[in-house]
Every structure is written in structure tokens, then in C-alpha cells.
Amino acid sequence: MLVRDFQRHVAQTSAAPLGLEIADARGSWLVDVRGRRYLDLLAGMGVANLGHGHPAIRRACAEQLRRYLHVMVYGELVLAPQVRLATRLTAVAGPPFETAYFTSSGAEAIEGALKTARKHTGRAGLVAFELGFHGDTLGALSIGGNRRYRAPFEPLLPQVTILPWNDVRALARVDRRVAAVVIEPVQAEGGVRVADTAFLRALRRRCSAVGALLVFDEVVTGLGRTGTLFAFQQSGVRPDLLVLAKALGGGLPLGAFLGSRRILATLARQPPLAHVTTFGGHPLSCAAAVAALDVTLARDLPTRAAAVGAILRRGLETLRARHRIVRDVRGVGLLIAIELGTPRATRRFAAACLERGVILNWTLHRDTVVRLAPPLTITRREVAHALGVIDAALHVAGRPA
């Protein structure tokens, strides 16, 4: 009955959702109403870095529930969870990040970053990259790198340029008409493609030379997934604005963009209230986020992601040698891709994993690439279990039709 009501009354985003009716979630596992357990290798699409239902997050939420929930639109009242989170985030991110603007989601944070860049620079041009994904709101979609998803909604924002990935020569098109260049240090929906350090450094130099703001979209990579707390720390390239979401809220809806006081102050004047949000930085979400950040740092989960990710990649490379259907294994930390030969094989592989109790899926812009982004707390035993299921599913996907 509930599945039928889900299909009838909850707006659908595809013709074939997973459709599992979930009764419980703990750690790396989801449990359906029949009691069957599923190993979640997507961490709720990169949200559950600490696993599902972490006790510290539950305690923080319970404590905040006893105090207050929403009390006023963003930016008017002093709310302790917001202040604590902004102080902690800017401290661990380091210069130039002095202040944080909180939102309800990653797409909303991207929208705020785009508005900030346009207002701060007085320019309209925006630059992004092929196969990039920054959200589905109108502005975020405008800088998306896959025309298949832009086309049904055009015309979108004007003066947007989409450049090829990792092409230093193409950066000459970033000129003094550009307000911002937006890039994911690792493209998630684009197939887990890692930006070259030399490319990011050249991009930083170009933005500085022409006065454009460099915006890093770390909605997926932020908070430890790549083996450092933020992916920009691996290249040493510091953006002007840093966009976070997904894992930031510890399972609750929360996004943010960080920058210097000078840049973000542009939203407070000429006119004042140039960018506002009702639910952005919700006290409950911020309380959960502080707890999540505390656990991430106390347990050094970025280092753990690097170590466990290396184990998972080695296991996948071993499977690659046994299964001709696997074309590539790549990634960083616990953001890993398995590239298969055809979209059909990819679908068969994902379905075979689900039948065996493992949840994963292909990326939005590369339908031959399966993404693995499990909780950073996944155990070595769970990794071994996942590799066994993946091995069996690759046998199924590799059989003749």
C-alpha cells in the first residue's frame, strides 16, 4: 500500500526508482520493512559520512529540540548553533574563509555564491566545465555541464561558458567579463573525474589575473570524503568561495558558502538584504552539523577515508583483472568509480548488486560509471562483504545477453 501511495502521490523523478520501503537505518546499513538489510555504498548520496543515525548527531538534535527550532529568517537573531558552526568551519578551512552563509541545500548555496560573485564583481559572465553538476535550480542548472539536462529548461542564464575538463589552454576564455568560475575538484556526477593539480593552479592564476572569483563546489567532496577535510587541501589551491552541503548537516538539510568578510559583505548592502533565506542555517541542522564535524575531526575520518578507500580500490583493481567488463577503476579517498563497457552492463551490474543487498548506482552524466561513496565509517569487514557482492554482480553483468 505504501509503495503504491509513493508512486501515486510523491512526485517521481524517474520511471524506475529503487522503491525500497525503509524501516530503519544504522551505520552503513538500511533495513526495509521486511527486515532485509542493505549495505549503503552511496551514504544517502554522500550525506551520511558518519553513517546513518550516528549517536552524537542524535544527541545533538535531541538537545536542540528541547530549546528551539525555527525562530526567524536567516541573519537577524544570534543563534548559538549557527555561530558555533560558522566559527568551527572557518577555523578548519583557514584563510581566506572568515565567514559562512548558511542555506538549506547545495543548490541554494550555489545560487548564493553566483549572486555574490555577480554583485561583488559587477560582472555577469559565468564559467563552468563539461559534465559538471551543481544542482537543479535555474542558476545551478545554467552552469551544468551536460546539455541533455539543460535543454528542456532553456533559455537559462545568459553569458555562461562551458569549458573542457582539465584543458589549461581553454582557460584563456576566462576574461574580465567573468564574475565567477565554478568547478568541482572531483566531478562526482561527471564520472568521478579528478581535476589535475596543474590545471587547478593554472585556473587560480587566471582568475586572479582577470579578477574573477574562483568557486569550488565541494558539496560532494567536502568534510573528509577525499582523504582530506576539504578536497582543495590536496592541491593547495584555495578558492575565493567554498560551497558545502550534503555531509555538512550530518543527515539534516544544510548548505553553506564560505568566503572572506569583504566578499560576503556585498550581500548586506546596496541594497541590504540582497540575499535572504527563511530556513537556511536551521538551528536543528546546525546543531547536527557541529556534532558531525566534531566526530569527523575527533576520529580523523579524512585519514580513515584515505586508508579504507585505498583498501577498497585495491580490491576493485583485483576484480578488474578478473572481469573484462571493467574498463577502469579510479577515484580518491572514499569517492570511487567503476567504469564498465556499456550502459546496459552498468544497469545489470547495479541491479545484481541490489538483489544481493548492496546499494550503488551509476552517475548522472556518465551512464557507464558506477559510483561508490560509502560512509567514512564503513568497516573493513563491510568493505570485504561489498567486494564479494561486486564480484558476483560483475559475473552477472558480464554474461552474454
Model-identified regions with their sequence ranges:
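Conserved N-terminal phosphate-binding loop of PLP-dependent enzymes in the Aspartate aminotransferase
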Residues: 1-401
